[in-house]
C-alpha cells in the first residue's frame, strides 16, 4: 500500500503560522481571510475555491519578484527553506516505519510494509501537525510506477475515476502527462504507456487500434538559431585523418530538400528511401559548415503533412511499429521489460 502525505496549502500556511508573509503587506489579516475562505469552499467542493488558491499561491512568487510591491526575498527564503526543513523532520519521523518513495515541495509518498501500519503512520503525522501547526492530507494508492521523481504515474485503489468522471490517478512527466493542443506531440505513445499501467493493455494493442492520424504526429519548429529545415538528405560516414595524422570518423550530408516552412507535423514512414528531417544553422566551424542537426525524437524515415490532418485517414505509409518501439523504450525507463 502506498500513501501520499500532502501538506494542505503548504506555503500559505507557513506564511500565516510563522508570520513569513511579505513585510510589505499592511494588513496580513486579509490574507488569512482569503486562506480560510478558500479552505471552506474547498471542503464544500465549490469550484470558486480555485481563484482563492491562485491568489494564495502566487504570493510566494511575488515575494521573489523585485518589480513587485510584495518583494521580500528574506521572507520568501524563510518559506522555502523552513518548509523543506519541516518536511525533512517529518521524513525522519517516518523513515523507520515505512519506505520513503519520493518527496517533493509539499508532500511525501511512502510505502507501508503492512496496511495495519497506517494507524501508526497517522499517529506520527498527527504529532508532527501538533508541533508545526500544519495540516496533512492523505491519499491511498495501490501501485506506483516511477522513472524518477519528476516522471511517474500513481494508480489508486478502487475506481480510476470519481463520480464526476475526473481521473483519480496522478501522473507527472512528459511520458505520461495529458497533452494539450499546444504540446500535442506523440500522444499515441503517452496513451499507450498510460493504458499499459492503468489497464494492462499492451502498447501494440493501443497503437494498432488507433485510427486518428493526428495522434501519431511529432511537431517540430525551426527556431531563430537556424536558417531552414532540410528533408531527406543523404547521410554517409567517412574516415579521415586530422592535422596530426590521427584517424577519425566524420558524418557528411549531401542533397536533400530545403524547406521554406518553419513548422512541421512529422510522421514515421515505412518507406526506407525517405530520410529524416534536420535543421541547418549554416555556422562555420573550423573552416567548414556545421553539419545539419536532426530534430529531437523524430524518426530516421519520415514524411510530413503541414495541412490539417483532423479527418485524414491513416495512410499505408505510416510506420506504426516505430511508435510501438518508442513506447516500449519509454516503458523500459520505468523498469518494464518488453
Kindly give the residue locations of the regions a language model identified.
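C-terminal, non-catalytic extensions of nucleic-acid polymerases
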Residues: 49, 88, 111, 116-338
Amino acid at each position: 500500500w502506498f500513501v501520499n502525505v500532502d501538506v494542505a496549502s503548504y506555503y500559505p500556511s507557513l506564511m500565516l503560522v510563522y508570520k513569513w508573509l511579505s513585510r510589505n503587506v499592511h494588513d496580513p489579516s486579509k490574507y488569512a481571510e482569503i486562506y480560510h475562505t478558500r479552505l471552506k469552499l474547498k471542503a464544500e467542493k465549490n469550484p470558486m475555491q480555485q481563484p482563492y488558491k491562485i491568489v494564495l499561491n502566487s504570493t510566494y512568487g511575488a515575494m521573489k519578484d523585485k518589480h513587485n510591491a510584495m518583494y521580500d526575498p528574506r521572507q520568501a527564503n524563510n518559506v522555502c527553506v523552513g518548509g523543506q526543513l519541516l518536511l525533512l523532520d517529518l521524513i525522519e519521523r517516518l523513515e523507520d516505519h515505512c519506505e520513503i518513495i519520493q518527496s517533493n515541495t509539499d508532500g511525501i509518498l511512502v510505502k507501508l510494509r503492512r496496511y495495519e501500519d497506517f494507524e501508526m503512520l497517522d499517529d506520527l503525522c498527527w504529532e508532527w501537525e501538533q508541533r508545526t501547526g500544519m495540516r496533512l492530507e492523505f491519499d491511498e494508492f495501490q501501485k506506483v510506477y516511477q522513472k524518477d521523481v519528476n516522471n511517474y504515474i500513481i494508480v489508486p485503489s478502487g475506481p480510476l475515476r470519481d463520480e464526476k468522471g475526473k481521473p483519480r490517478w496522478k501522473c507527472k512527466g512528459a511520458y505520461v502527462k495529458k497533452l494539450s493542443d499546444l504540446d500535442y506531440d506523440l500522444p499515441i505513445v503517452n496513451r499507450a504507456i498510460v493504458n499499459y499501467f492503468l489497464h494492462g493493455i499492451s502498447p501494440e494493442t493501443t497503437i494498432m487500434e488507433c485510427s486518428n492520424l493526428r495522434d501519431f504526429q511529432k511537431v517540430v519548429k525551426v527556431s531563430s538559431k537556424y536558417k531552414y529545415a532540410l528533408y531527406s538528405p543523404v547521410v554517409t560516414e567517412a574516415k579521415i585523418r586530422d592535422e596530426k595524422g590521427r584517424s577519425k570518423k566524420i558524418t557528411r550530408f549531401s542533397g536533400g530538400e530545403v524547406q521554406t516552412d518553419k513548422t512541421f507535423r512529422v510522421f514515421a514512414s515505412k518507406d526506407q528511401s525517405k530520410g529524416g528531417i534536420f535543421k541547418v544553422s549554416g555556422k562555420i566551424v573550423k573552416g567548414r559548415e556545421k553539419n545539419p542537426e536532426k530534430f529531437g525524437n523524430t524518426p530516421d524515415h519520415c514524411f510530413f503533412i503541414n495541412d490539417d490532418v483532423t479527418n485524414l485517414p491513416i495512410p499505408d505509409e505510416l510506420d506504426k511499429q516505430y511508435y510501438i518501439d518508442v513506447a516500449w523504450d519509454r516503458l523500459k525507463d520505468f523498469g518494464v521489460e518488453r
